[in-house]
Amino acid sequence: MLLGDGRPNSINISAQGNLLPNPRETSLKIFPSKNYLDPKWTLNTMQWGQILAHDISLTASTSIIDTPSPTCCNNEGQYTSESDSNRFCAAIPIPRTKNSYSADARQCFDFVRTVTTNDTGCTAAGAPSYPINENTCYLDLSLIYGVSDNQSKSLREGKGGRMLTVERNGGVWPPQAANAQETCTPSIPANDTCYVAGDPRINQNPELAVLQTMLLKEHNRKADTLSQMNGRWDDDKIFQETRRIIIAMYQQINYYEFLPILLGRDNMLENKIIYEDPTDYINDYNNEISAGITNEFTTAAFRYFHTLIRGRLDIVKENRNLERTLRLSDWYNRPSVIEEPDAFDGLARGLSYQPEDKADQYFDEETTQYLFRGNSTKGSDLRAIDIQRGRDHRLASYVALRRYCGLSVPKTFDDLSEYISKSNIKKLKSLYKLVDDIDLTVGGALEKHARGALMGPTYLCISLIQFYKIRTGDRFFYENGNNKNIAFTPSQLATIRKGSSLARLVCDNGINIKSMQPRAFELVSPKNKIVPCDSLPSVDLSLWKEKKQKKTGDNK
């Protein structure tokens, strides 16, 4: 597969022509399996980050060019015949080192390369080839509504503006997949619980499924209210207006509640990504700015937050006592657990009560030793995959991105000491021949955090640019009032700003959740106490009630 440099087999060769270190070895040495809990932020922060990531990015698979996806390395960790013959194969070799499965003779981790513009015939002769993103670049909840009219229609009920759902086990759930073995995993019965949504990854882990289900239920709650208030509205009018409201609430949560945690509120204010207590429209749409998702953001900077993942998921009672704990790798692509009695609400409470792992260089072993293990005793390594994906996408080096961001540029390994620890510099020296060879996925993850942020200066630079582009490159962004035909009224915008929060979303869409702390991304504390759900602000939908038109000749 030809990428930007025109070489078919250069995935592990640096721009300087040096052999790059084995991704699995790099993962083990630089990103070992340890757990340090975040002292302030809940697991919601990690999980909402995955919601956002899945909304704006989906690595293109071979299905878009009508080609079956190859198996490059099988479930037993052995190379297949396709490994050498299929151009999309780039299986990750497992080195014979301690803690690297050498005892059970596993040879590799499966890895399938991303489909590029060259593969689809969209690259001119001699031009660079780029990896394809199957999702839209806008914060438009495509993971709920889909990315096309046809997909959206297939997910709609067709009446009352509602989305399709099913009722069973005392709850309301996303539609059931026709064949769970094909959609979720071959290791479960064909009729087992497995969901269909706007994004195919809804089943990936239980807490992702919980939050996506809540967003789906929120749409139908709002649609029912609008339908009751506005009897003359047809199905499509209700659907489109509900979708517009839900997306606006979601954008408000992202920009004013979630992203300040990752990027730092002051950093966002300084870069005009948010504004101080806005009361009016923010008309910053620029038709010359593309909201497109950069390769550096989606393939490196935002994947850094895989470090936040916890390998044990708490199911928590209403009184916040622990009921039980799930092992993450038991439930990859097996969402049935969320339909067990009290599990849906219990996992939602757990997301809001359990701390996430700290943003650091350490990863939970459930993601680096047991990823997607199915019924096997061992699995894959998410961090090794992240490193390999960066090379697959031909990311510029860590040093190149520091230069692009206007940061100090190291010429030697020792020059890194200003922002990377000496112990990590020593590890980098043992893996890379030159400082210019360091992967962006690796170097950026080792930087000391920038002021107010949960990431270092290089990733912060990339992320600030990205989220500025997403808001200013979207003419439908909820705070934009330039076009009165698509803008919210001032009073509607005000209630969206006041009544949109993750806490309210969880309260309204649990099965029997009675209480929540107001700032659900933040751990419970004396300044963030658990309160009754009814006390939390909500969006006032009466502001969408259509005014009755006067009859002709009626002067009253």
Please state what every model-predicted region is.
Residues 1-206, 224, 229-556:
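Terminal regions of secretory-pathway proteins
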Residues 205-217:
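Alpha-helical bundle segments that constitute or directly flank the non-heme di-iron/ferroxidase center
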Residues 216-220, 395:
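Hydrophobic faces of stable alpha-helices that mediate helix-helix packing
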